[in-house]
């Protein structure tokens, strides 16, 4: 396996930030990239989904104190492609359309974003100090603009809404869920609008992010494109 340090020995511990809208394939690409480079894959979107799931379970009110307590009392662990939230394995539970919608909703609160920013930075620092990985590949909203603005390289992955909706439709059908394409497309467009227009940390590419449009590219082609950019780091 080619490690990041064999690509550029000038970076002792790399941080790669991958951002982009919902349903664009960030999770799969980030996981493949981390495996290829010997880094830890951190799905920050899943961290927000864990909060959204607990929010749903506890019926937590929408005030700062309650949300702060929710954030501080939520313990998230990622290991072996599984996600644990306060001792409950939630890998599949947090992938429902309902939790997805709640995740977008809860992420609009500044108090939640501040807590999650701290949790994400602490996670990466723990990984750095452990020496277990060559670096970290972080995927999710605001990674390159807010959480790690000094990341070694930033990607903003995008694709046409119709193509993203089709991918999501196929994914849910494979899981045996009864879904309608038009409903998924409408929900995706609504989430795009909310994410791009929200007042707190809107979805925008970092000024120095590399834009990757996956609309007409296969998975391996996208991965190779990203690796070529990484090899050019000086």
Where do the model's predicted regions map?
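ATP-dependent NMP and nucleoside kinases share a basic, alpha-helical "lid"
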Residues: 91-175
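N-terminal phosphate/diphosphate-binding loop that engages ATP/GTP or pyrophosphate donors
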Residues: 35-97
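Hydrophobic anchor at the beta1->P-loop junction of P-loop NTPases
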Residues: 16-18
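Conserved lysine of the Walker
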Residues: 26
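Hydrophobic positions on the alpha1 helix immediately C-terminal to the Walker A/P-loop
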Residues: 29
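An amphipathic alpha-helix signature
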Residues: 161-169, 181, 185, 189, ...
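NTP-dependent small-molecule kinase module
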Residues: 4-10, 85-91, 169-177, 194-234
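P-loop (Walker A) phosphate-binding loop of NTP-binding proteins
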Residues: 21
């Amino acid at each position: 396996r080619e490690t990041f340090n064999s690509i550029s020995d000038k970076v002792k511990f790399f941080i790669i930030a991958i951002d982009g809208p919902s349903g664009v394939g960030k999770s799969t690409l980030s996981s493949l990239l981390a495996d290829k480079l010997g880094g830890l894959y951190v799905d920050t979107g899943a961290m927000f989904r864990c909060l959204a799931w607990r929010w749903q379970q506890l019926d937590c009110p929408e005030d700062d104190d309650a949300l702060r307590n929710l954030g501080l009392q939520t313990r998230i662990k990622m290991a072996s492609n599984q996600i644990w939230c306060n001792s409950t394995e939630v890998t599949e539970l947090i992938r429902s359309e309902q939790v997805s919608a709640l995740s977008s909703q809860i992420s609009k609160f500044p108090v939640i974003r501040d807590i999650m920013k701290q949790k994400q930075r602490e996670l990466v620092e723990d990984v750095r100090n452990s020496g277990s990985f060559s670096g970290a590949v972080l995927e999710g909203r605001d990674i390159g603009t807010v959480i790690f603005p000094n990341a070694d390289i930033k990607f903003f992955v995008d694709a046409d809404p119709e193509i993203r909706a089709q991918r999501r439709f196929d994914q849910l059908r494979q899981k045996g869920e009864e879904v309608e394409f038009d409903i998924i497309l409408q929900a995706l467009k609504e989430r795009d609008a909310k994410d791009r227009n929200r007042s707190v940390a809107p979805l925008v590419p970092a000024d120095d992010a590399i834009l990757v449009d996956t609309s007409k590219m296969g998975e391996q082609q996208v991965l190779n494109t990203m690796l070529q950019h990484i090899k050019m780091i000086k």
